[in-house]
């Protein structure tokens, strides 16, 4: 891209590093940023820096929060006896959109993936086991994606949690195999939650 100024090239390269953003999309985003007023551009930059500095993990469920407990763990209206295990925080947002689930969550921050060198020790599994071992959990719903890594993670966790006498269920397959929760529509997620099964 020798025809662009160096600062613009750098901006395009940074946008292209984001997942799902190719070269042309990165260029469009970079040119849009250049069309912003100085105040708008500064507000955009500040929002990125602030999110990076302030967003942390909830000490209970490992969901994203801007300090202390996440709103779901802090809510007395949520059923604390049921935990829905998801791969990442985007899956929490997808399930919350269904308005069907009233329990709490546990965010693993990934799935077991030997091909990507991600093992159980790289995930938030120890904190999940500690929550279940505390003895006040009745059911753990495995809501990892229905792909190879998601299935492997769900089966691994089911074997790990079974000795605690907790009911371990899996979302029903209203979600297509190889699909991702964040792209599922609300009705599909509702059916998947209603049709979960024990594993």
Model-predicted segments: where are they?
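Signal for well-folded cores of large energy- and translation-related assemblies
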Residues: 16, 34, 49, 66, ...
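Extended interfacial segments that mediate partner engagement and assembly in macromolecular machines
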Residues: 26, 75-144
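Cys/His-rich Zn2+-binding cysteine-cluster or related metal-binding knuckle/ribbon modules and their
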Residues: 2-8, 17, 30-92
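Catalytic cores of large soluble enzymes that bind and process phosphate-bearing ligands
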Residues: 3, 36, 40, 116-120, ...
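Long C-terminal interaction/binding lobes of large macromolecular proteins
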Residues: 129-141, 145-199
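S-adenosyl-L-methionine-dependent methyltransferase catalytic core, i.e., the SAM/SAH-binding region
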Residues: 9-16, 27, 33-36, 63-64, ...
């Amino acid at each position: 891209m020798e025809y662009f100024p160096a600062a613009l090239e750098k901006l395009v390269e940074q946008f292209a590093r984001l997942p799902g953003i190719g070269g042309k999309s990165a260029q469009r985003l970079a040119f849009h940023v250049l069309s912003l007023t100085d105040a708008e551009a500064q507000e955009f930059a500040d929002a990125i820096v602030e999110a990076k500095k302030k967003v942390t993990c909830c000490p209970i469920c490992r969901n994203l929060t801007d300090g202390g407990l996440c709103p779901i763990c802090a809510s007395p209206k949520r059923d604390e006896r049921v935990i829905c295990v998801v791969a990442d925080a985007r899956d929490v947002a997808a399930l919350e959109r269904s308005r069907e689930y009233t329990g709490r969550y546990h965010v693993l921050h990934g799935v077991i993936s030997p091909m990507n060198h991600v093992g159980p020790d790289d995930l938030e599994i120890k904190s999940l086991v500690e929550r279940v071992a505390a003895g006040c959990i009745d059911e753990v719903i495995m809501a990892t994606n229905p792909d190879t890594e998601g299935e492997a993670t769900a089966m691994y966790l089911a074997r790990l949690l079974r000795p605690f006498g907790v009911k371990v269920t899996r979302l029903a397959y209203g979600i297509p195999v190889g699909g991702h929760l964040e792209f599922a529509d609300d009705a599909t997620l509702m059916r998947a939650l209603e049709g979960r099964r024990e594993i």
